Amino acid sequence: EVQLQQSGPELVKPGASVKMSCKASGYTFTDYYMKWVKQSHGKSLEWIGDINPNNGGTSYNQKFKGKATLTVDKSSSTAYMQLNSLTSEDSAVYYCARDRYWYFDVWGAGTTVTVSS
């Protein structure tokens, strides 16, 4: 069974950073790009960026450049996203999704990030 297992919820203070994970199983990790998506309450999904697990190449939505950093660990079939300098605007659910030619065919359950002092 193809699965993406995301790390648990995070409660962080303004100005801090957070790093979440997305562990892939059931397929060859390096065969598919991994996308990251933000779902803010009451808003539509926003594409953050994607990473090629084969070579670590990344592409970012301009809005999230400097905010998000995407990395992978091929040895554990895990993708990571670090978010920096957090503010209340970063409170959201963040999803990883396997990219099949811009059709996101497998999704993680999401990681909830709450930024609060």
Swiss-Prot record:
Entry keyword set: Adaptive immunity, Disulfide bond, Immunity, Immunoglobulin
Q: Which domain of life is it from?
A: Eukaryota
Q: Which SMART domains match?
A: IG, IGv
Q: Which CDD domains match?
A: IgV_H
| Ig-like domain mapped to chain residues | 1-116
Has the keyword Disulfide bond been applied to this entry?
yes
Cystine links in this protein are: C22-C96
Which molecular function terms from Gene Ontology are attached? antigen binding
> What are the GO cellular component annotations?
extracellular region; immunoglobulin complex
Q: Name one GO biological process term.
A: immunoglobulin mediated immune response
Pfam family name, one: V-set
Its signal peptide is: none
Q: Which InterPro entries match?
A: Ig-like_dom, Ig-like_dom_sf, Ig-like_fold, Ig_sub, Ig_V-set, IgHV
Q: Does Disulfide bond appear among the keywords?
A: yes
Further information: The sequences of 10 hybridoma proteins that also bind dextran differ from that shown at 1-7 positions, many of which occur in the D and J segments. This protein binds dextran.
Q: What is the recorded name of this protein?
A: Ig heavy chain V region J558
What is the species listed in this Swiss-Prot or TrEMBL entry? Mus musculus
